[in-house]
Every structure is written in structure tokens, then in C-alpha cells.
Amino acid sequence: MSWIKEGELSLWERFCANIIKAGPMPKHIAFIMDGNRRYAKKCQVERQEGHSQGFNKLAETLRWCLNLGILEVTVYAFSIENFKRSKSEVDGLMDLARQKFSRLMEEKEKLQKHGVCIRVLGDLHLLPLDLQELIAQAVQATKNYNKCFLNVCFAYTSRHEISNAVREMAWGVEQGLLDPSDISESLLDKCLYTNRSPHPDILIRTSGEVRLSDFLLWQTSHSCLVFQPVLWPEYTFWNLFEAILQFQMNHSVLQKARDMYAEERKRQQLERDQATVTEQLLREGLQASGDAQLRRTRLHKLSARREERVQGFLQALELKRADWLARLGTASA
């Protein structure tokens, strides 16, 4: 089965899609593709067949999203917790991943045609080396495409992602790229695997389970959470349509919460900067409440220097990650 399933919506689907597009549309949807094993049991087939059908449904769902103008999709393909499953099932999932990433490399022309950028998010060091190399090749082959984006979370949990981001910031301080005072929520956000993506507008979980299973916990604090009873391989265009309707009904509340959170971040940063400037002035024997122009000048310099350090650190971090991926992809070429 192809990664990209080409084709148009049916006449009725197109009609309903045009209606729903009159409202606010999500730009980024995340999926917890749950229910493959229960589907296999229901259909009395092997678990591996259930996972294969789940991948086929992903390709179909990407087609729906593309036709609806939803240009970024993130999927929870394999949790670090899944390594605790039986060896036979884990081995089967690794084999399926090998097949699908090998197939992806055979479809480079189709990916180029649609401008699909594939990103794989997670701790790839936990995967077999040959699979790491296949993933690196796929990511490298599509990294310059920018019409639409598929983020595959593989060997991923949100706690692992956040702890890794904290380690990256600590590395920046150790290397002298950052000051300890530069550490903030905003910087942590930029150190996550998802740093190049906007936060999801909708998170959809299938199979009826009402939990996030350690998926995008940081990124979905202001997302529309939709839990649907359908098993993932049985997901339909109308299930997606329903999720978008829920998003539209809650859009104004979600947007207001996002705006308030962004303003609160700015306020907290300004308070920290003001406290730092006050401390500097007192150390120099000047009145903390003295010359307003001097305080503004100091605040501006403090902010500019921090931004310069942060940008230098982020460039170094991106270079470090890209270099590792490039060397991995070259090793298997």
C-alpha cells in the first residue's frame, strides 16, 4: 500500500467539504491511531494484518486531509511503551516499518509531486540500526518539500520528548551558548521534536479510549480533543468530518485560550527582565526606580542579547540534529 493514496473525494463528500470549509478549518491534526489489534481480533485475522490495515487507513486519511486543505498531520505510530509488548509483535511492527519506509523511498516522485515532507519524531536510537538508516534516508529525501507535512511519531512518548528538550537546554548552558536565565517555557517549546510545527488544532483518538497515552502532552494543551469509538482501520471520511465540526464549535474558546496563554508568557518574561534590570541597577548603586529611559535601554539590551544567544543555540542544536541524521542516511546509501 502506498503512503499517498491519490484520488478525489466523492461528489457527496466534496459537497459537504465545501460547506465545512466556510468555517474555520484546522491547519494541523494529530491522530492516535488506536484499535488495530481489536480490529484484527474482530475480523479473526493476525495482529500483523490489523497493523497493515491501519497503515492503509493512514494513507486514505492523508488523502482526505489533503483534499480538505489540512496540510499537516501528526500520527502516533509507535510508543516507547510498545517495546513492552511481546517480542513477536514488536518484531512484526519493526518489519512493517522497514517495509513501509522502503516503499516510501520507491515513491519519491509521488512525494515530490505533492511536496510531502516526512518527519520522524522520537528517539531513533532505540530502533534497530537498519531501520534508523531507512528512516534517515526518507527524512533526508523529503526535507526540502514544503507543501504538506507528515510527522510520524516513532519510538516516542511526550515525557521522553520533554526530558530530551531539558537535556538539550542543559547542553546549551554547558557549551556556553545559553545563560541559565535564558531557560523558559518558550525555549523548551523550541527544543521539542515538534519545534518546526504549529501545535495541533485537533487531536483525534480512535477506538473509544479516553486518554492521551503520553502523546503530545505539551503541544495539545489548547487543542480540541476528540475521542471517537470507531476502530482505526474502520475510520471514515465522516468521522473526520465530525471531528472538524467539533473543532469549529469550540474554535473561539480555543483561540481565546491560546491568545491568553501567549500574552501570559510575554508578561512573565517581561517581569523576569525587569527584575534582572532592577538587580543590575542596585548592584551599580543606582536607584531601582530611577531614570525610566535608562531602564528601557537596559531592558532592550537584555532582550536583544538573550535573543541573540537563543538563536545561536537553536542553530547549533538544529545543526547537531541534522548532522547526525545526514551521517546516518549516508551510511546506508
Swiss-Prot record:
Q: What is stated about pH in the biophysicochemical properties?
A: Optimum pH is 8-9. Active from pH 5.5 to 9.3.
Q: Name one GO biological process term.
A: dolichyl diphosphate biosynthetic process
InterPro entries in the record: UPP_synth-like, UPP_synth-like_CS, UPP_synth-like_sf
Q: Name one GO molecular function term.
A: ditrans,polycis-polyprenyl diphosphate synthase [(2E,6E)-farnesyl diphosphate specific] activity
What CDD domains does the record tag this protein with? Cis_IPPS
- Where, per UniProt, does this protein localize? Endoplasmic reticulum membrane
The UniProt catalytic activity note for this protein reads: n isopentenyl diphosphate + (2E,6E)-farnesyl diphosphate = a di-trans,poly-cis-polyprenyl diphosphate + n diphosphate
Which parts pass through the membrane? none
Per the record, what is the consequence of mutating residue 38 to H? Answer: Strongly reduced cis-prenyltransferase activity
Q: Found in which tissues?
A: Ubiquitous. Expressed at high levels in testis and kidney. Expressed in epididymis (at protein level).
Per the record, what about its domains? Answer: The catalytic site at NUS1-DHDDS interface accomodates both the allylic and the homoallylic IPP substrates to the S1 and S2 pockets respectively. The beta-phosphate groups of IPP substrates form hydrogen bonds with the RXG motif of NUS1 and four conserved residues of DHDDS (Arg-85, Arg-205, Arg-211 and Ser-213), while the allylic isopentenyl group is pointed toward the hydrophobic tunnel of the S1 pocket where the product elongation occurs.
What this protein is called in its record is: Dehydrodolichyl diphosphate synthase complex subunit DHDDS
